[in-house]
Amino acid sequence: MESKTYYLLRTEEYGDYEMFTIVEDKYFFDHIHRSDKITQVKPDYDRFGFKICEDEQTYLTNYIIELETLSLFDIDTVDRLIASTENKLGIYGHLYCLYIKNNRLDLCDYLIQSNYEYDPTSNCDDILEFVPDENEADVLMYIINNNNFFKIKWSEIATHVIGYTECYDVIDYLVNFLKQIDCNIDYDTIIEECYYSRDGYSDDTFFNETIKILLRLECVNVNKLLEIACIFSITEIVTHLLDIGTEYDFNTILKSHISLHILKIFLNRGNILDSDSVKILLSTNKGWKFSQTFSYLMDEQYITQELVDKNLVDIVIDNNFPVLKRLIEKFDLSELIDYDVVMKKAIMNSSLDIIDYCISNGTDVNNYMTYAFQHYNQSCFTHLLNQGGTLSTDNLVYRPENLRESKYQNVQYIDIVIDNNLDSIENILDNVLEYYHYNTDICNYVLNKINYNSIVLPKLTNKIIRNYYYNECINDKYIDLVKSKINPNDIDKSIIAIVTDDFDSAKQLIMENNLYDNLKILFVAIMKYDIDMLKFLFEINDNSNDYLQWTLLFSLVGNCKSVKFIMEDIGVKPERMKEFRFIMKKSRDTCTKYFKLNGYDVSIDNEDNCDEYPVVKFFKEMGIYLGDYIYTL
């Protein structure tokens, strides 16, 4: 190995332990990551404790000697690397992208003249993505004029230049060039896809200028373009196309789901809305466009009783429920409405006026109280109560997980759940705590309904651990609960003491309550990674090899900094190898490399029965994700 040439790929710190990934020169281009400088190194074989191991064409080692830093802008360096590369297929993509990105077209020329081929079908990066803003037009022209070498699809170049640049001279040149070589490009589709990528519905001055260039060059279908511009409400292009005399069928335009603003452009140019065209507008529009257009048609009295049929009413109910109120106010819909459907929609949308309308037309509010509770909204439910509704517990649908959402966390809903014995206080609190923003007032309200000093929350420990694991801190709501609101168990008190740095109290609680071998406390201590606290636990459990094996497994998930401490300072060696390898797969890459460098087999065994592993069962109980394994409480 000593006679080989190596380059440094990456340095990783593992606490106070450094690991280096180095690569032999012949595999350099297989692993380089968008760098313009590289460091030649050699393993420091003479250092005490030196280790090295192979890792998929690269090597892991703990000691290196840096020899020199080289630049990939230096031709001699590049030639030497290329000459030593074993597999030259597709290796030049990085270099071309690097030189394009840095405006080094002279170096691209050198690669081309040296016949170092760019292969767009290889795994190298897309060279167009690296075109810099500075000198963008010149770089694009370079790619276009050398595309017989780059072999990028002309459609991809056209899409990039037209959709993502403001280089109008380049656009003009490219379109004319493609005409000369008889290359057919679907510019209409490019334009449409560009609008979709911009989420549409907004005028883009620069892109509009591009479209005008394409119109001038006569490479787009004006009728198709008008349709696209109408759909995406591109006012400037619609106006421009009409100004240059583009022919169109007004009713066809109306079928394009146009906005009110676009509609007015056509009306201001002499187009007339008759009953047929109004029907088209009413039957094809949905969403916010329909709401605006509908209000305009109502205000201008285009909509008459004759046009209001069941089909229109159904469209409004299904897709634009908020505008139903205006129809109700002006027209007789008594024979056109399914009041059951409308009442449920009104409850879902909290449309109090529509609810009142249904009630005034004979709807029995009591038939919908259960439905309103299932789709609870406080203002809507209160309104139904004020209208004489009473809630029956028969067939009442209650979902405990609803309490994890803000709209259910109010006194009215909580009282209904408690007064009707739909759930226990413990479960109510458990679910209230699951809400991300946490409603302190509601939690206090629930606690004040009972003697909270006697309440036991069996899932609280797991919630605290899961919260700390995912956030690397503890939410104040758990600290408040443990300290003042309830009578927590000693495990909860110990865990809160550890995560709040009150280690003396934690040690006292552990000793007084014989919790020295509790795995949940151990896992939190591993995550906290306080050396003194860990030594305290290890000294008590020094004779329990099983406990020490748990510490190593937890360190792979909880805090990788602790791995080196547990392995080298405490002297724990992995023995539960199936669990060890399984957790290793879910652990951080740095952790895996540490074990590999220290001579351990980290290959994955068959995982068919992994659910039976004790460590998997532990995390399943906590509700902690392990890679592809998803656990919920």
Swiss-Prot record:
Renumbered ranges of ANK repeats: 91-120, 123-152, 221-250, 252-275, 338-367, 369-393, 517-546
Domain of life: Viruses
Keywords, ordered alphabetically: ANK repeat, Repeat
Protein name from the UniProt record: Putative ankyrin repeat protein L774
Organism of origin: Acanthamoeba polyphaga mimivirus
